[in-house]
């Protein structure tokens, strides 16, 4: 399984997301249950490197480590920029083990 490292974030919204993107990062969210979600930030370069090396990346389960807590997730949705090769946002869905 692939491993991705992320950092939890406390500031959410348009302004905070724009600041992240200026730092070459992007916001993401882990849907844990119907009630709770975890907001995280990921590195644009790290994610693109993983994406380019693994063709089955979108179909397989991924280990996502956020602040030393391990989640097994699947990608639910990716939002990309219209003409740049940048990711704007990703939704992850936690897989129950």
Curated annotation (Swiss-Prot):
The gene is rplY. It comes from Buchnera aphidicola subsp. Baizongia pistaciae (strain Bp). Keywords: Ribonucleoprotein, Ribosomal protein, RNA-binding, rRNA-binding. This is Large ribosomal subunit protein bL25. Part of the 50S ribosomal subunit; part of the 5S rRNA/L5/L18/L25 subcomplex. Contacts the 5S rRNA. Binds to the 5S rRNA independently of L5 and L18. Belongs to the bacterial ribosomal protein bL25 family. SUPFAM superfamilies: Ribosomal protein L25-like. Gene3D superfamilies: Ribosomal Protein L25, Chain P (2.40.240.10). GO terms for molecular function: 5S rRNA binding; structural constituent of ribosome. The keyword Transcription regulation does not apply. This is one of the proteins that binds to the 5S RNA in the ribosome where it forms part of the central protuberance. It holds the Pfam family Ribosomal_L25p. GO terms for biological process: translation. GO terms for cellular component: ribonucleoprotein complex; ribosome.
């Amino acid at each position: 399984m692939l491993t991705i490292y992320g950092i939890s974030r406390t500031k959410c919204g348009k302004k905070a997301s724009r600041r992240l993107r200026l730092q070459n990062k992007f916001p993401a969210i882990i849907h844990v249950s119907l009630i709770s979600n975890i907001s995280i930030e990921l590195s644009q370069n790290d994610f693109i490197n993983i994406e380019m090396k693994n063709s089955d990346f979108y179909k397989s389960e991924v280990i996502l480590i956020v602040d030393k807590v391990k989640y097994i997730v699947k990608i639910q949705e990716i939002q990309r920029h219209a003409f740049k090769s940048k990711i704007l946002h990703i939704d992850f869905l936690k897989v129950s083990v």
